[in-house]
Each structure stands twice: as C-alpha cells, then as structure tokens.
Amino acid sequence: MPWIQLRINTNSDDAETISDLLMEEGSVSITFEDGKDTPIFEPKLGETPLWRDTVVVALFDAETDLTPTIAMLKTLPFLGENFSHKVEQIEDKDWVREWMDNFHPIQFGTRLWICPSWREIPDPTAVNVILDPGLAFGTGTHPTTALCLEWLDSLDLSNKEVIDFGCGSGILAVAALKLGAKNVTGIDIDYQAIDASRANAERNDVADKLALYLPEDQPADLKADVLVANILAGPLRELAPLIAERVKTGGKLALSGLLKEQAQEISDFYSQWFDMDVAAHKEDWSRLTGKRK
C-alpha cells in the first residue's frame, strides 16, 4: 500500500524531540538523514550521533490527514510558522524481494564463490558458500568483506585453527571452513550475529566445526593460526592487545573495516606484535595483513 511521507529539515538538537512528537501523532516509522552530506564514519560504542543539519523522515498510513500534525509543529518555538518540510505520497515496495533479486553469486579469488541460498550455484565444483544473511551484516558485496574473502581464498587453511573476530553473518567463518580450516571460532557482540552465523554454518554443513561466543564468553586460552577481524578502526585499536594474544607465533592476521586514511595508523600500531604487509585497497576501504612475531 502507499504511504504518506513527511520530511522535516531541522538540526541535531531538535531531531529527537520532533521524532517523539511524530510518533505520538501516529507515525509508523522514523528515520534520520544527513541534511548536508556530512559523513559520520565511526560513532563511539553506545552513541547514536546525528548530523548538525538533520532531516527527520516520518512515514504515516496513506489515509492519515497530516493537517493537524503540521499545525502542531508550527507552534513549536524551534520550528516556527514557516518551518521547512515536504509531504509526499510514496509507493510501497517489497524491499526484501527487490534486494534478493539483485543479490547474485559472486566469485572471490580463484576457488571461492558466495551463493545466495535462493540462487542456482554457477560452478558446483568450486568452493561454494551458501549464504542467507538474515539480520546480520555480511554478504560479500561490501569491499571490506570482499577483501577478507579474497585473502582467505589465497591461504592454505588445511588443518588450521581460525578466529573470526566480529563474525556478523558468519560469511568469513563459513568460508574458512569450506576452504579447509580445521575449526573456526566466531566472536561477536550481537546475539543476532551469533544466530545468523550458526544458521549459515548449518546450511553449509560445517556447524560441528564452528564455535560461537559473545566476547565475554570466549575462552581465556583461545589461540589460532589465522585471525580475521572485519570490524572498525576504533575497536581494532582498542582490541589490539587481545587480538595479538589470540594469534599463535608465526600466525597470520587480516584486519579490515578500515578506511584508506585509517590504514597506516592501524598498521603502525599493530607492528609492535606483527610484521605488517603493504595494505590492499578496494574503493575507499583497506585490508591489512601481517604475521605474528
């Protein structure tokens, strides 16, 4: 069914108040957008930062009369009689179906394919990971995930123990197992990620080789031959001593979730534990690799 969309130009100080008022007026969905294309790359844990110029976007049922709502908004001192807004009708879409229609099998490196569960496998003789991302991040389409998958494909993982730090959908963990890893430990702060990783491991018949933990539950003596962490620069720096402790001497490391301009600083920081290689790049993103000293 169609929807009525109300867009209000405001600022970060007032956006939350407007959002609360619109929910009271019957809005079924509220989102915030950047009013002036100003990026926020990496909020601190627990923060939900907003842009200085923020657009509040509210959806209402198509039958909703917004006249009283707009009249109420005009009485707010921080908006005023002539506040900037736009009302339009938008058609509903089956967004899940649209996304599924555009997610096709993708090859990474020479052996590895990531195949959506609803698509036919292009090469049955290849190493195929059958993926249903569900609620967690990680389909292989993002440059950071692609960089990590290409790196895993380049390794000989036979009889290797692997850690996937920030496992998300489990795509890297499952790929490592399908590429021959002895076992993989996946760690994530999100229960949904743990569930999605488990489901994708079961779909690929490798669940018996995958152990999944929240950070506080991971074994204290956990060690691996290979560790991959596709998270963000801030957590990578904060977790560096723990990540280094988890990699065996001579073991291999891959870090991603980094913007190009962040890569050198993180590489320099990790060099106290690892012999770091030259960074690899894809679009605006980077991957760092190294060997444990």
From Swiss-Prot:
Q: What Gene3D superfamilies does the database record attribute to this sequence?
A: Vaccinia Virus protein VP39 (3.40.50.150)
Where is the protein found, in the record's own terms? Cytoplasm
Name one cellular component (GO) term. Answer: cytosol
Q: Which UniProt keywords apply?
A: Cytoplasm, Methyltransferase, S-adenosyl-L-methionine, Transferase
Q: Which InterPro entries match?
A: Ribosomal_L11_MeTrfase_PrmA, Ribosomal_PrmA_MeTrfase, SAM-dependent_MTases_sf
Annotated S-adenosyl-L-methionine binding lies at: 145, 166, 188, 230
Q: Which GO terms describe its molecular function?
A: protein-lysine N-methyltransferase activity
UniProt key word Transferase: yes
Keyword field contains Aminoacyl-tRNA synthetase: no
Give, as one word, the top-level EC class.
transferase
Q: Which domain of life is it from?
A: Bacteria
Which BP terms does GO give this entry? Answer: methylation
Q: What is its EC number?
A: 2.1.1.-
Q: Which reaction does it catalyse?
A: L-lysyl-[protein] + 3 S-adenosyl-L-methionine = N(6),N(6),N(6)-trimethyl-L-lysyl-[protein] + 3 S-adenosyl-L-homocysteine + 3 H(+)
What the protein does comes down to: Methylates ribosomal protein L11.
**Family statement:** Belongs to the methyltransferase superfamily. PrmA family.
Name used for this protein in its record: Ribosomal protein L11 methyltransferase
Q: Source species, please? A: Shewanella baltica (strain OS185)
- Output the lineage of the source organism: Bacteria, Pseudomonadati, Pseudomonadota, Gammaproteobacteria, Alteromonadales
